[in-house]
Amino acid sequence: MNFQPLGKRVLVKRVEETKTTASGIIIPDNAKEKPLMGEVVAVSKEITDIANGDKIVFAKYGGTEIKLDNNEYLVLNLDDILGILK
């Protein structure tokens, strides 16, 4: 299913963090915080500074979670994006 964000929004797939610490301790899913980084999957036509495939950092409480084709995504307003990782 294709999703085209409207307004000044982007569709982001969260970057999954590792499930173990450097010393090998396994972190259960319910103890992990949701990552604040993701990869841009779709961009509104109004946004020119961000492109598909960019890795971004976003605000902790920003965005709306949605599910498409059994995958979880986040729809973010441009104001919730803090920066692009290069």
UniProtKB/Swiss-Prot annotation:
Pfam families: Cpn10 (PF00166). One of its GO terms (cellular component) is cytoplasm. SMART domains: Cpn10. Signal peptide: none annotated. Keywords: Chaperone, Cytoplasm. It is found in: Cytoplasm. One of its GO terms (biological process) is chaperone cofactor-dependent protein refolding. It comes from the Bacteria. GO terms for molecular function: ATP binding; metal ion binding; protein folding chaperone; protein-folding chaperone binding; unfolded protein binding. NCBIfam families: PRK00364.3-3 (NF001537). Together with the chaperonin GroEL, plays an essential role in assisting protein folding. The GroEL-GroES system forms a nano-cage that allows encapsulation of the non-native substrate proteins and provides a physical environment optimized to promote and accelerate protein folding. GroES binds to the apical surface of the GroEL ring, thereby capping the opening of the GroEL channel. Belongs to the GroES chaperonin family. Heptamer of 7 subunits arranged in a ring. Interacts with the chaperonin GroEL. This is Co-chaperonin GroES. The lineage of its organism: Bacteria, Pseudomonadati, Campylobacterota, Epsilonproteobacteria, Campylobacterales.
